[in-house]
Amino acid sequence: MLISVLKSKISYATITQKELFYIGSITIDEAIMERAQLTINEQVQIVNLNNGERLETYVIPGKRNSNIIALNGPAARKGEIGDQLFILSYALIDPTQEKLDPVLVDLKLND
């Protein structure tokens, strides 16, 4: 049996940009993506700490070291510039065969 477990978590990502008329996704600074071990087009869950909104989308890389966190397309309606987010990704594992320690990136601490 496979179970879904936390693979990566980016804490306290701040929305820096919104692009409503875009095809969708969340843009994340490529350096932050690498630290969190997220891949291009990987599915993520977004939790907005300011308003409680939750959504699922996929990741696209932003300019390295720009600190960009952009909600794109319909997701842009789920937050405002300056809102703080948790960005979560999950993996399916067989708990009898393996254990997964999640990668935690805390941007509030400048991890």
UniProtKB/Swiss-Prot annotation:
A single BP term in Gene Ontology: alanine biosynthetic process
A molecular-function term among this protein's GO annotations: aspartate 1-decarboxylase activity
Disulfide bonds: none
Catalytic reactions of this protein: L-aspartate + H(+) = beta-alanine + CO2
Localization per Swiss-Prot or TrEMBL: Cytoplasm
EC number of the protein: 4.1.1.11
PTM section of the record: Is synthesized initially as an inactive proenzyme, which is activated by self-cleavage at a specific serine bond to produce a beta-subunit with a hydroxyl group at its C-terminus and an alpha-subunit with a pyruvoyl group at its N-terminus.
Annotated positions binding substrate: T57, G73, P74, A75
One protein family per Pfam: Asp_decarbox
Pathway terms, separated by semicolons: Cofactor biosynthesis; (R)-pantothenate biosynthesis; beta-alanine from L-aspartate: step 1/1
PANTHER family, alphabetized: ASPARTATE 1-DECARBOXYLASE (PTHR21012:SF0)
Function: Catalyzes the pyruvoyl-dependent decarboxylation of aspartate to produce beta-alanine.
Sequence similarity: Belongs to the PanD family.
Oligomer status and interactors: Heterooctamer of four alpha and four beta subunits.
Annotated protein name in UniProt: Aspartate 1-decarboxylase
Annotated source species: Coxiella burnetii (strain RSA 493 / Nine Mile phase I)
